[in-house]
Every structure is written in structure tokens, then in C-alpha cells.
């Protein structure tokens, strides 16, 4: 079916202060000084009261984690300002909003005509009662309710959900700033798990289409501009080109131009992510298209089901961590990927489809397993 390549204390009671003489009127000044020094010395040896985590916790000002009632402004948060906290955006109009940090959850309510960039969100991003929004979002869960006309460049680990929303358009996340890769890691998100085009409409209307995909050549800057040069974000090096994006640009559920696809799997190692990015660069430079990617953990029984005849040789490789899989598409892609495996990744632990006769089955076996594993 395919081929693979490998290389080998309890708290102490505080001491009591030494008692100063009170009844001995003959005590000299030197005696008193010495006694005082002794007392001070005893105090200095006392053990400090035990501190608990809630004693050390910094006080949080809720206003630092909200943007409310703003109009015609460029606002947001710089890297390092949220550090995994929750964030709220509400009642903003005609604003450019840049939240360039990782967070726990973000809710956006009653905003109109805003351009928004949200750094990686560990939990959910929830838009409610918003209109005319253009945004770049990376999150675990994405949901909208009662929204109209949104253009979303999305990276979402689970299936995005829209509810009572119309005029929704989606594209693949394309964004870069220097801290973004670290923010993905801090938020527990994989750049390879992106279901941006797999939208679930919770309230479909017969005969109407509430959502669609943005044109394949859609450019982020045409929807979400860079920060104002006079704003606090002017020092952040932002890029929106697909080749610079932290998240790989995938075709998603759009129709493929070729019937030939290839499964390419990297097993866990020190350079798995770098190798996957290199393969994408090599393949796209030759005109092939990246359809989808996944990063998942596998068990021995999963290997048997997915890789079938090659399972025995691959089982030991899955113990080192998750695998990263890519589907590449285009006429001649299988032969090209096998050449990449031999010439570029020789000695790397990987699996690549053996022939175009079995490659479609390889792709279906792996990504059906991955979707089940992730509950999609």
C-alpha cells in the first residue's frame, strides 16, 4: 500500500523576643543596647509566614481584558498582555482590533463594521449580534449567533458552527507575527489541525445558503488591513502572505483539480514540523496543492487499521508522539512525493503512498480515522 523510510514542612512557632529588663534600675545604657540587639537578632531569625498561591496571585483589573464602546479606533493588546486570560470585545464600531496574544476564551458582542485579528484562543471564540465583520481567528472552537456578513480567515481545531447567521464567508487562516508560533503552543493548538471549511449550520433555511467559502485567491489585506503606523502595534512585524503564515494554506473542501492525491505522514521527531513545512514548500513550488493536514496520536490498533500491510513496521514509531499527515493533490503527485522522500527526507521516519492506484485509499483511511479521533 505504501512505503516508509527510517533511521536508526510543618510551620515553626516564632521565637519569642528577648525580654527587656524592667525592674533593674541599675542596668546601664550599654546593657540595654546589647539587650535590644539580641532582641532584634531574634526577630531576624523568625520564619516568614507561609504564603499560599492565592496570596501571591496578582490582582487583575477587568478593564485590562475588555474593549467596550469604542468607535473609529485602532486598539487591542500587544503580545504578553493577556497571557491566557479571557477577553471580551463589545459595542465597538468601525474599529481595527488586534489581539496579538494567546487567551482562554474571547466573546465579541454587538460589534459593527470592525476588522479583528485574534491570536490563538485555547477555548472558544463566540461572535454574537455582530454585523459587517472581517476577521482573522485561531481557536479551538468557533461559533456565531445572530450575525450578518462576516468574512473569516479561520484556523479552528473543531468544526465551526454558525447559528441564525447569514452572509458568512470563510477562508483559510493566513497570518504571521514573531510570537505567533509560541502562542499556538501556549494555547494548546496545532497548526496542522484546521477545519476552516467544514462549517456546520445549526439553523439551515431551505433554499438559502447562509455560508460559503471566500475565493481561493482571497488576500487577507483586502479584508483586514495592517495596524495604523501611528498605533501601538507599529513595532509588531506582521505578515499576511500565505508563504509566511504560521498555519499552512489548505484548499479545504473546495473541489480538487486532479483525481490523484498522495498521503505523506511524518512520525514524531525533533524536526517533524520543520519537515512538514519543507515538504509543503517543495510540493507547492512544483505546482501541487495542499488539500488538508492533521496532527493526531495513534495507538497500535489504529496503525493496523490505517496502514494495513505496513502496520507491523510502523507500530514502534507512534510511541514517540503524534504523527503529522498531509494530503497533496495533482497529476504525478505520488511519484513526486516518493522522490521527495528519497532525496529530501532520506533517513526520516515517514510513510508515503506507494502508487496512485492505492493512494486514494491511503488518504481516506487516514483522514477518516483522524476525523473520528477528533470527534468531527
Curated annotation (Swiss-Prot):
Keywords: Cell membrane, Cell projection, GTP-binding, GTPase activation, Lipoprotein, Membrane, Myristate, Nucleotide-binding, Palmitate, Protein transport, Transport
Membrane topology designation: Lipid-anchor
Domain annotation C-CAP/cofactor C-like: ranges: 49-204
PTM characteristics: Myristoylated on Gly-2; which may be required for membrane targeting.
Region described as Disordered: 1-55
Lipid-conjugated positions (N-myristoyl glycine): 2
Composition bias type Polar residues, residue spans: 25-48
Annotated InterPro entries: C-CAP_CF_C-like, CAP/MinC_C, CAP_C_sf, CARP_motif, NDK-like_dom_sf, Tubulin-bd_cofactor_C_dom, XRP2
Record bears the keyword DNA damage: no
Lipid-substituted positions (S-palmitoyl cysteine): 3
GO biological process, one term: pronephros development
Cellular localization per UniProt: Cell membrane; Cell projection, Cilium
Tissue localization of expression: In the retina, detected in both rod and cone photoreceptors (at protein level). Has strongest expression in the retinal outer nuclear layer (ONL) and weaker expression in the outer plexiform layer (OPL) and inner plexiform layer (IPL) (at protein level). Expressed in all tissues tested.
Pfam families in UniProt: TBCC
One MF term in the entry's GO annotations: GTPase activator activity
Disruption phenotype: Viable and fertile. Early retinal development appears to be grossly normal. Outer segments of rod and cone photoreceptors show progressive degeneration from 2 months of age, with rod cells more severely affected in the early stages.
Binding locations of GTP: 123-124, 140-143
Gene3D superfamilies attached to this UniProt entry: 2.160.20.70, Nucleoside diphosphate kinase-like domain (3.30.70.141)
Gene Ontology CC: cilium; periciliary membrane compartment
Keyword Coiled coil: no
Similarity-based family: Belongs to the TBCC family.
Function field: Acts as a GTPase-activating protein (GAP) involved in trafficking between the Golgi and the ciliary membrane. Acts as a GTPase-activating protein (GAP) for tubulin in concert with tubulin-specific chaperone C, but does not enhance tubulin heterodimerization. In the retina, required for maintenance of rod and cone photoreceptor cells. May have a role in normal retinal localization of the transducins GNB1 and GNAT1, and the rhodopsin kinase GRK1.
Entry protein name: Protein XRP2
Amino acid at each position: 500500500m505504501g512505503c516508509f523510510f527510517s533511521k536508526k514542612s510543618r510551620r515553626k512557632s516564632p521565637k519569642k523576643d528577648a525580654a527587656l529588663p524592667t525592674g533593674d534600675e541599675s542596668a546601664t545604657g550599654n546593657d540595654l543596647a546589647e539587650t535590644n540587639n539580641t532582641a532584634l537578632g531574634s526577630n531576624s531569625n523568625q520564619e516568614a509566614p507561609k504564603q499560599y498561591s492565592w496570596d501571591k496571585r496578582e490582582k487583575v483589573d477587568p478593564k485590562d481584558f475588555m474593549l467596550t464602546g469604542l468607535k473609529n479606533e485602532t486598539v487591542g493588546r500587544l503580545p504578553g498582555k493577556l497571557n491566557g486570560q479571557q477577553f471580551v470585545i463589545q459595542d465597538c464600531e468601525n474599529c481595527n482590533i488586534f489581539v496579538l496574544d494567546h487567551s482562554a476564551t474571547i466573546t465579541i458582542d454587538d460589534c459593527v463594521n470592525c476588522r479583528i485579528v485574534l491570536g490563538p484562543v485555547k477555548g472558544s471564540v463566540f461572535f454574537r449580534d455582530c454585523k459587517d465583520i472581517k476577521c482573522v481567528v485561531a481557536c479551538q472552537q468557533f461559533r456565531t449567533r445572530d450575525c450578518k456578513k462576516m468574512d473569516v480567515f479561520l484556523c479552528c481545531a473543531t468544526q465551526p458552527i454558525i447559528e441564525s447567521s447569514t452572509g458568512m464567508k470563510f477562508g483559510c487562516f493566513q497570518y504571521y507575527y514573531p510570537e505567533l508560533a509560541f502562542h499556538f503552543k501556549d494555547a494548546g493548538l496545532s497548526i496542522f489541525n484546521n477545519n476552516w471549511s467544514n462549517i456546520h449550520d445549526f439553523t439551515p433555511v431551505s433554499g438559502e445558503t447562509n455560508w460559503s467559502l471566500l475565493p481561493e485567491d482571497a488576500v487577507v489585506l483586502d479584508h483586514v488591513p495592517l495596524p495604523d503606523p501611528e498605533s501601538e502595534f507599529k513595532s509588531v512585524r506582521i505578515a499576511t502572505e500565505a508563504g509566511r503564515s504560521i498555519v499552512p494554506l489548505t484548499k479545504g473542501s473546495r473541489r480538487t483539480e486532479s483525481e490523484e492525491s498522495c498521503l505523506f505522514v511524518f512520525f514524531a521527531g525533533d524536526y517533524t514540523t520543520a519537515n512538514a513545512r519543507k515538504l509543503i514548500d517543495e510540493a507547492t513550488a512544483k505546482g501541487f496543492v495542499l488539500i488538508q493536514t492533521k496532527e493526531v496520536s495513534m495507538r497500535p490498533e489504529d496503525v493496523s487499521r490505517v496502514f494495513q500491510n505496513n502496520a507491523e513496521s510502523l507500530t514502534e514509531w507512534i510511541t514517540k508522539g503524534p504523527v503529522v499527515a498531509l494530503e497533496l493533490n495533482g497529476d504525478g503527485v505520488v511519484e513526486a512525493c516518493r522522490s521527495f522522500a528519497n532525496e529530501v527526507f532520506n533517513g526520516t521516519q515517514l510513510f508515503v503512498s506507494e502508487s496512485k492506484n492505492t493512494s486514494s485509499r491511503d488518504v481516506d483511511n487516514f483522514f477518516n480515522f483522524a476525523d473520528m479521533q477528533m470527534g468531527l
